[in-house]
Regions:
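Signature of short aromatic-glycine-proline-rich micro-motifs recurring in repeat-based ectodomains
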Residues: 60-63, 158-164
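Beta-strand-rich domains and repeat architectures in extracellular enzymes and scaffolds
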Residues: 49-82
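Conserved loop/turn motif of beta-propeller repeat scaffolds
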Residues: 69-73, 111, 169-170, 212-213, ...
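Extracytoplasmic/periplasmic ligand-binding sensor domains
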Residues: 54-57, 83, 89, 104, ...
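Sequence/structural signature of beta-propeller modules
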Residues: 1-60
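Surface-exposed loop/turn elements that mediate protein-protein interactions on large endomembrane-trafficking
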Residues: 27-53, 78-96, 126-154, 178-203, ...
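Hydrophobic core register within WD40 beta-propeller blades
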Residues: 64, 105, 164, 207-208, ...
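Long amphipathic alpha-helical scaffold regions
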Residues: 92-116
Length: 345
């Protein structure tokens, strides 16, 4: 009996000590956690796999283009548009609708979406607009305020869509049309889906737009100057050309010397001209060799020697084959039908 009492007594003592110990530990960790800085770690499902996947492009492919981050590559083969996911190698054919023909496609500047234009084969003056989301292989048509498809009626069935620019965050669209008489029309599609003619001239060259502003930017090729709609912003007494814009709505223009770029001026059009930053080249450059990424880095391509130079650091980065695109993170090139990538990070 005495032995049983001792066992019970020591069991109770052990239980009390254990409870006290757990209580103290709990309070300690509670206090510690309350005074500990917690860092959130996000794992993005779209992070590129480390394993290299061979991406092959048909040698007879045309209009080979990359999405803004290089995750997707598109090309035409036998008039058929194909999109390839460079992360996993999957392919998707983008088909036109019934009685329609795909006549234009372009990757948007800040998303893995494309803008598509389809011509109605029964009424060839009518062009219907679509967006293609490469992430889910989904093609949809944007609509106006009455839920009607956005359709542009050309003046002539021989007119061609030559460019479409969209400020991604605003919901408007500019469409450049090359007419059969040699002129260019610029159509403006507003946030309500209404389309009007904005400009009509033989003198319109390259066109562009900002990410968060509604202004259209275009080259006036007669006067060799850059113009911006709904703005008095203009550089006088210099021949200039449009190069690009970046994610921060900075405008990049080239100052020309004998048709080649001597220096780059960039900055916000909300500031005065004298506030622009200037980058001067030692030698003039062909504007087609100048790339400006979404994060505002400037690269100059030397296709003969196979390298690009980052302007800020003067660092030369080699690549193989033909340059396809420079993104914020990589240089994409093609060599004998194979997609190659050089990491910039």
């Amino acid at each position: 009996m005495k032995t049983l009492k001792k066992v019970v007594t020591w069991s109770l003592v052990a239980l009390l000590l254990q409870s006290a110990l757990f209580f103290m530990v709990d309070k300690y960790y509670e206090k510690t956690l309350m005074n500990t800085k917690v860092t959130e770690v996000r794992v993005y499902k779209d992070s590129k796999p480390q394993k290299n996947i061979a991406i092959n492009i048909p040698l007879d492919a045309e209009k080979i283009e990359a999405s803004f981050d290089g995750k997707y590559i598109s090309y035409y083969e036998n008039s058929e548009l194909t999109s390839i996911n460079t992360y996993d190698g999957s392919k998707h054919t983008i088909n036109a609708g019934n009685n329609s023909k795909l006549v234009y496609s372009k990757w948007l500047p800040a998303t893995n979406n494309m803008i598509l234009c389809e011509q109605n084969l029964n009424s060839r003056r009518n062009i219907t607009f679509f967006t293609y989301d490469a992430e889910n292989s989904n093609k949809v048509t944007p609509t106006d305020t009455n839920n009607h498809n956005i359709i542009l009626t050309l003046n002539n069935s021989a007119d061609k869509i030559s460019n479409v620019v969209l400020p991604s965050s605003i919901g408007i669209m500019y469409i450049k049309v090359l007419k059969s008489n040699g002129k260019n029309d610029i159509f403006y599609n507003d946030a309500n889906g209404k389309t009007t003619t904005l400009l009509s001239s033989k003198n319109i060259g390259n066109v562009g737009a900002f990410e968060n502003k509604s202004n259209l930017i275009y080259d006036d090729i007669t006067n060799n100057t850059v113009r911006i709609t709904n703005s008095t912003w203009k550089i006088n007494n210099k021949q200039t050309c449009l190069l690009n814009t970046d994610d921060s709505d900075n405008l990049y223009i080239g100052v020309l010397e004998n048709g080649r770029v001597r220096k780059i001026l960039y900055g916000s059009i909300d500031a005065t001209i004298d506030k622009l930053t200037s980058l001067t080249f030692k030698e003039t450059e062909n504007k087609i060799n100048i790339s400006i990424t979404r994060n505002g880095k400037v690269y100059v391509n030397n296709g003969v020697k196979g390298y690009v130079t980052e302007n800020a650091t003067n660092k030369k980065i080699s690549y193989k084959g033909k340059l396809l695109k420079i993104t914020d993170k990589a240089i994409l090139s093609l060599l004998s039908g194979k997609l190659l990538e050089v990491n910039l990070n």
